[in-house]
Protein backbone atom coordinates (compact mmCIF):
# COMPACT_ATOMS: atom_id res chain seq x y z
CA UNK A 1 0.00 0.00 0.00
CA UNK A 2 2.82 2.40 0.85
CA UNK A 3 4.48 1.81 -2.53
CA UNK A 4 1.20 2.32 -4.37
CA UNK A 5 0.79 5.64 -2.57
CA UNK A 6 4.18 6.81 -3.78
CA UNK A 7 6.54 5.65 -1.05
CA UNK A 8 10.14 4.95 -2.05
CA UNK A 9 11.00 1.32 -1.21
CA UNK A 10 14.60 0.09 -0.86
CA UNK A 11 15.76 -3.47 -0.15
CA UNK A 12 18.99 -5.03 1.04
CA UNK A 13 18.94 -8.83 1.00
CA UNK A 14 20.95 -11.98 0.31
CA UNK A 15 18.66 -13.00 -2.58
CA UNK A 16 16.41 -11.43 -5.21
CA UNK A 17 12.80 -12.04 -4.22
CA UNK A 18 9.52 -11.44 -6.01
CA UNK A 19 7.49 -8.38 -5.02
CA UNK A 20 4.42 -6.93 -6.67
CA UNK A 21 5.13 -3.23 -6.19
CA UNK A 22 7.73 -0.73 -7.46
CA UNK A 23 11.18 -0.92 -5.83
CA UNK A 24 13.60 2.00 -5.98
CA UNK A 25 16.82 0.17 -5.04
CA UNK A 26 17.68 -3.47 -4.40
CA UNK A 27 21.12 -4.39 -3.06
CA UNK A 28 21.86 -8.12 -3.29
CA UNK A 29 24.65 -9.13 -0.95
CA UNK A 30 26.28 -12.34 0.17
CA UNK A 31 25.87 -13.19 3.84
CA UNK A 32 29.30 -11.97 4.94
CA UNK A 33 28.99 -8.64 3.08
CA UNK A 34 25.48 -7.89 4.37
CA UNK A 35 26.84 -6.23 7.52
CA UNK A 36 29.21 -3.99 5.56
CA UNK A 37 26.52 -2.94 3.07
CA UNK A 38 24.28 -1.78 5.90
CA UNK A 39 27.23 0.01 7.47
CA UNK A 40 28.01 1.73 4.17
CA UNK A 41 24.51 3.22 4.01
CA UNK A 42 25.07 4.52 7.56
CA UNK A 43 28.45 5.92 6.48
CA UNK A 44 26.87 7.67 3.50
CA UNK A 45 24.19 9.10 5.79
CA UNK A 46 26.81 10.46 8.22
CA UNK A 47 28.45 12.33 5.33
CA UNK A 48 25.15 13.78 4.14
CA UNK A 49 24.04 14.75 7.66
CA UNK A 50 27.19 16.81 8.32
CA UNK A 51 26.66 16.33 12.05
CA UNK A 52 29.17 15.76 14.81
CA UNK A 53 29.10 11.98 15.10
CA UNK A 54 30.46 10.46 18.34
CA UNK A 55 34.10 9.51 17.91
CA UNK A 56 33.63 5.77 18.49
CA UNK A 57 30.95 5.68 15.77
CA UNK A 58 33.04 7.69 13.31
CA UNK A 59 36.04 5.44 13.89
CA UNK A 60 33.93 2.36 13.15
CA UNK A 61 32.48 3.90 9.97
CA UNK A 62 35.96 4.97 8.82
CA UNK A 63 37.04 1.31 8.83
CA UNK A 64 34.55 0.62 6.03
CA UNK A 65 35.22 1.08 2.32
CA UNK A 66 33.66 3.96 0.41
CA UNK A 67 29.88 3.83 -0.24
CA UNK A 68 28.85 3.29 -3.84
CA UNK A 69 26.16 5.20 -5.72
CA UNK A 70 23.35 2.93 -4.49
CA UNK A 71 24.38 3.28 -0.84
CA UNK A 72 24.39 7.05 -1.25
CA UNK A 73 21.04 7.05 -3.04
CA UNK A 74 19.36 5.05 -0.28
CA UNK A 75 20.86 7.32 2.38
CA UNK A 76 19.80 10.45 0.48
CA UNK A 77 16.21 9.23 0.21
CA UNK A 78 16.03 8.88 4.00
CA UNK A 79 16.80 12.59 4.27
CA UNK A 80 14.60 13.86 1.44
CA UNK A 81 11.52 11.77 2.27
CA UNK A 82 9.26 12.45 5.25
CA UNK A 83 8.03 9.82 7.70
CA UNK A 84 10.77 7.29 6.89
CA UNK A 85 10.88 3.78 8.31
CA UNK A 86 13.69 1.22 8.60
CA UNK A 87 12.60 -2.41 8.90
CA UNK A 88 14.97 -5.04 10.25
CA UNK A 89 14.02 -8.44 8.85
CA UNK A 90 14.50 -12.14 9.52
CA UNK A 91 17.68 -12.51 7.47
CA UNK A 92 19.55 -9.99 9.60
CA UNK A 93 18.01 -11.32 12.83
CA UNK A 94 19.41 -14.79 12.09
CA UNK A 95 22.80 -13.42 11.02
CA UNK A 96 25.83 -14.27 13.17
CA UNK A 97 26.64 -10.52 13.33
CA UNK A 98 23.10 -9.42 14.12
CA UNK A 99 24.27 -7.23 17.02
CA UNK A 100 26.48 -5.21 14.67
CA UNK A 101 23.72 -5.01 12.04
CA UNK A 102 21.33 -3.72 14.70
CA UNK A 103 23.84 -1.07 15.77
CA UNK A 104 24.29 0.15 12.19
CA UNK A 105 20.53 0.30 11.61
CA UNK A 106 19.98 2.21 14.86
CA UNK A 107 22.73 4.68 13.98
CA UNK A 108 21.26 5.12 10.50
CA UNK A 109 17.82 5.74 12.02
CA UNK A 110 19.28 8.28 14.43
CA UNK A 111 21.14 10.16 11.69
CA UNK A 112 18.08 10.30 9.41
CA UNK A 113 15.43 10.71 12.14
CA UNK A 114 13.70 7.54 10.91
CA UNK A 115 11.35 5.20 12.71
CA UNK A 116 12.47 1.64 13.42
CA UNK A 117 10.57 -1.62 13.00
CA UNK A 118 11.40 -5.29 13.57
CA UNK A 119 10.08 -8.20 11.53
CA UNK A 120 10.15 -11.22 13.83
CA UNK A 121 9.84 -14.94 13.18
CA UNK A 122 6.72 -15.07 15.34
CA UNK A 123 3.55 -13.08 14.75
CA UNK A 124 3.36 -11.95 18.36
CA UNK A 125 6.94 -11.57 19.57
CA UNK A 126 6.21 -8.04 20.78
CA UNK A 127 3.19 -9.33 22.67
CA UNK A 128 5.34 -11.96 24.38
CA UNK A 129 7.82 -9.27 25.44
CA UNK A 130 5.19 -6.88 26.77
CA UNK A 131 3.25 -9.54 28.68
CA UNK A 132 6.39 -10.87 30.35
CA UNK A 133 6.55 -14.21 28.52
CA UNK A 134 10.31 -14.01 28.04
CA UNK A 135 13.05 -14.83 30.57
CA UNK A 136 14.16 -11.33 31.62
CA UNK A 137 10.97 -9.25 31.57
CA UNK A 138 7.79 -8.86 33.59
CA UNK A 139 4.55 -7.18 32.50
CA UNK A 140 4.97 -4.12 30.24
CA UNK A 141 8.68 -4.69 29.73
CA UNK A 142 9.73 -4.25 33.36
CA UNK A 143 13.05 -5.88 34.19
CA UNK A 144 13.01 -9.09 36.18
CA UNK A 145 15.44 -11.68 37.42
CA UNK A 146 16.41 -13.63 34.34
CA UNK A 147 14.93 -17.08 33.94
CA UNK A 148 15.95 -19.76 31.45
CA UNK A 149 15.97 -19.10 27.72
CA UNK A 150 14.76 -21.65 25.16
CA UNK A 151 18.14 -23.32 24.71
CA UNK A 152 18.71 -23.54 28.46
CA UNK A 153 15.27 -25.10 28.96
CA UNK A 154 15.85 -27.61 26.17
CA UNK A 155 19.32 -28.52 27.47
CA UNK A 156 18.15 -29.79 30.87
CA UNK A 157 16.04 -32.58 32.26
CA UNK A 158 13.21 -31.29 34.46
CA UNK A 159 10.95 -32.57 37.20
CA UNK A 160 8.09 -31.07 35.17
CA UNK A 161 8.20 -29.82 31.59
CA UNK A 162 5.14 -28.14 30.05
CA UNK A 163 4.83 -27.37 26.34
CA UNK A 164 1.92 -25.18 25.26
CA UNK A 165 1.04 -24.84 21.57
CA UNK A 166 4.56 -25.86 20.60
CA UNK A 167 5.65 -28.53 18.16
CA UNK A 168 9.14 -29.96 17.96
CA UNK A 169 9.39 -28.76 14.33
CA UNK A 170 8.93 -25.19 15.57
CA UNK A 171 12.23 -25.30 17.44
CA UNK A 172 15.76 -24.57 16.29
CA UNK A 173 16.93 -26.95 19.04
CA UNK A 174 14.61 -29.82 18.11
CA UNK A 175 17.05 -32.66 18.81
CA UNK A 176 18.13 -31.17 22.14
CA UNK A 177 14.50 -30.64 23.16
CA UNK A 178 13.63 -34.22 22.24
CA UNK A 179 16.35 -35.44 24.64
CA UNK A 180 14.91 -33.21 27.38
CA UNK A 181 11.45 -34.70 26.82
CA UNK A 182 12.91 -38.19 27.15
CA UNK A 183 14.85 -37.31 30.31
CA UNK A 184 12.27 -35.23 32.22
CA UNK A 185 10.24 -36.90 34.98
CA UNK A 186 6.84 -35.50 33.96
CA UNK A 187 5.91 -34.02 30.56
CA UNK A 188 2.61 -32.20 29.98
CA UNK A 189 1.76 -31.05 26.45
CA UNK A 190 -1.04 -28.73 25.33
CA UNK A 191 -1.34 -29.01 21.56
CA UNK A 192 -3.73 -29.09 18.62
CA UNK A 193 -1.97 -31.95 16.83
CA UNK A 194 -0.20 -35.11 17.89
CA UNK A 195 3.43 -35.70 16.99
CA UNK A 196 5.25 -39.01 17.28
CA UNK A 197 7.76 -37.54 19.75
CA UNK A 198 4.93 -36.26 21.95
CA UNK A 199 3.07 -39.54 21.68
CA UNK A 200 6.17 -41.42 22.81
CA UNK A 201 7.32 -39.20 25.68
CA UNK A 202 4.43 -37.07 27.02
CA UNK A 203 2.74 -38.22 30.22
CA UNK A 204 -0.31 -35.98 29.73
CA UNK A 205 -1.57 -34.53 26.43
CA UNK A 206 -4.33 -31.90 26.57
CA UNK A 207 -5.96 -30.92 23.24
CA UNK A 208 -6.36 -27.22 22.54
CA UNK A 209 -7.89 -25.20 19.72
CA UNK A 210 -5.78 -23.82 16.90
CA UNK A 211 -5.28 -20.09 16.40
CA UNK A 212 -8.00 -20.25 13.75
CA UNK A 213 -10.51 -21.43 16.38
CA UNK A 214 -9.54 -18.99 19.12
CA UNK A 215 -9.66 -15.36 20.12
CA UNK A 216 -6.79 -13.10 21.03
CA UNK A 217 -4.82 -10.02 20.09
CA UNK A 218 -1.43 -9.02 18.78
CA UNK A 219 0.58 -5.86 18.27
CA UNK A 220 1.29 -5.15 14.62
CA UNK A 221 4.32 -3.53 13.03
CA UNK A 222 2.96 -0.01 13.51
CA UNK A 223 2.28 -0.48 17.22
CA UNK A 224 -1.48 -0.98 16.90
CA UNK A 225 -3.25 -3.61 18.98
CA UNK A 226 -5.40 -5.79 16.73
CA UNK A 227 -8.02 -8.24 18.01
CA UNK A 228 -9.45 -11.36 16.45
CA UNK A 229 -12.19 -13.72 17.62
CA UNK A 230 -12.60 -16.91 15.63
CA UNK A 231 -14.66 -18.37 18.49
CA UNK A 232 -17.66 -16.50 17.09
CA UNK A 233 -17.74 -19.06 14.28
CA UNK A 234 -18.00 -21.99 16.70
CA UNK A 235 -20.93 -23.43 18.72
CA UNK A 236 -21.70 -21.76 22.06
CA UNK A 237 -20.76 -24.86 24.05
CA UNK A 238 -17.29 -25.02 22.45
CA UNK A 239 -14.61 -25.21 25.17
CA UNK A 240 -12.14 -22.40 24.54
CA UNK A 241 -8.44 -22.31 25.38
CA UNK A 242 -9.14 -19.36 27.65
CA UNK A 243 -11.74 -21.34 29.61
CA UNK A 244 -9.34 -24.28 29.90
CA UNK A 245 -6.52 -22.15 31.29
CA UNK A 246 -8.89 -20.26 33.59
CA UNK A 247 -10.15 -23.53 35.07
CA UNK A 248 -6.60 -24.72 35.67
CA UNK A 249 -5.68 -21.44 37.39
CA UNK A 250 -8.82 -21.59 39.54
CA UNK A 251 -7.89 -25.12 40.63
CA UNK A 252 -4.70 -23.66 42.09
CA UNK A 253 -6.56 -20.74 43.75
CA UNK A 254 -4.37 -18.25 41.90
CA UNK A 255 -5.40 -14.71 41.01
CA UNK A 256 -6.27 -14.03 37.39
CA UNK A 257 -5.15 -10.56 36.28
CA UNK A 258 -7.69 -8.29 34.59
CA UNK A 259 -7.07 -8.26 30.85
CA UNK A 260 -9.10 -5.05 30.43
CA UNK A 261 -6.90 -3.25 32.98
CA UNK A 262 -3.82 -4.51 31.16
CA UNK A 263 -5.09 -3.19 27.80
CA UNK A 264 -5.58 0.28 29.31
CA UNK A 265 -1.98 0.30 30.56
CA UNK A 266 -0.77 -1.16 27.28
CA UNK A 267 -2.11 1.70 25.16
CA UNK A 268 -0.13 4.22 27.20
CA UNK A 269 2.96 1.98 27.14
CA UNK A 270 2.90 1.73 23.33
CA UNK A 271 2.43 5.49 22.90
CA UNK A 272 5.39 6.20 25.18
CA UNK A 273 7.55 3.59 23.44
CA UNK A 274 6.88 5.12 20.02
CA UNK A 275 7.37 8.70 21.23
CA UNK A 276 10.57 8.01 23.18
CA UNK A 277 12.99 6.70 20.58
CA UNK A 278 15.87 4.93 22.26
CA UNK A 279 18.47 4.35 19.56
CA UNK A 280 21.37 1.97 20.17
CA UNK A 281 24.58 3.93 19.58
CA UNK A 282 27.12 1.41 20.83
CA UNK A 283 28.82 -1.40 18.98
CA UNK A 284 28.99 -5.00 20.21
CA UNK A 285 32.20 -6.19 21.80
CA UNK A 286 34.22 -8.28 19.36
CA UNK A 287 35.37 -11.48 21.04
CA UNK A 288 38.79 -12.86 20.16
CA UNK A 289 37.51 -16.35 19.38
CA UNK A 290 34.64 -15.27 17.18
CA UNK A 291 34.78 -16.35 13.54
CA UNK A 292 32.48 -15.27 10.70
CA UNK A 293 29.69 -17.59 9.62
CA UNK A 294 28.72 -17.42 5.96
CA UNK A 295 25.20 -18.86 6.39
CA UNK A 296 22.00 -17.66 8.02
CA UNK A 297 19.00 -19.49 9.39
CA UNK A 298 16.38 -19.46 6.64
CA UNK A 299 12.68 -20.22 6.73
CA UNK A 300 10.07 -21.72 4.46
CA UNK A 301 7.12 -19.35 4.66
CA UNK A 302 4.62 -22.24 4.63
CA UNK A 303 6.35 -24.24 7.35
CA UNK A 304 6.24 -21.76 10.20
CA UNK A 305 3.26 -23.17 12.07
CA UNK A 306 1.31 -26.40 12.51
CA UNK A 307 -1.59 -25.42 10.25
CA UNK A 308 0.55 -24.29 7.31
CA UNK A 309 2.77 -27.36 7.51
CA UNK A 310 -0.28 -29.61 7.23
CA UNK A 311 -1.88 -27.78 4.28
CA UNK A 312 -1.33 -29.92 1.19
CA UNK A 313 -2.32 -27.18 -1.30
CA UNK A 314 0.12 -24.70 0.27
CA UNK A 315 2.91 -27.27 0.21
CA UNK A 316 2.45 -27.56 -3.57
CA UNK A 317 2.97 -23.84 -4.24
CA UNK A 318 6.13 -22.23 -5.56
CA UNK A 319 6.52 -20.30 -2.30
CA UNK A 320 6.64 -23.51 -0.26
CA UNK A 321 9.79 -24.48 -2.12
CA UNK A 322 11.38 -21.07 -1.67
CA UNK A 323 13.54 -20.47 1.37
CA UNK A 324 13.18 -16.93 2.78
Give the label of every model feature segment.
Residues 101, 263-324:
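Long, low-complexity segments enriched in small/aliphatic residues
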Residues 1-276, 324:
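Non-catalytic alpha/beta scaffold blocks inside enzyme catalytic domains
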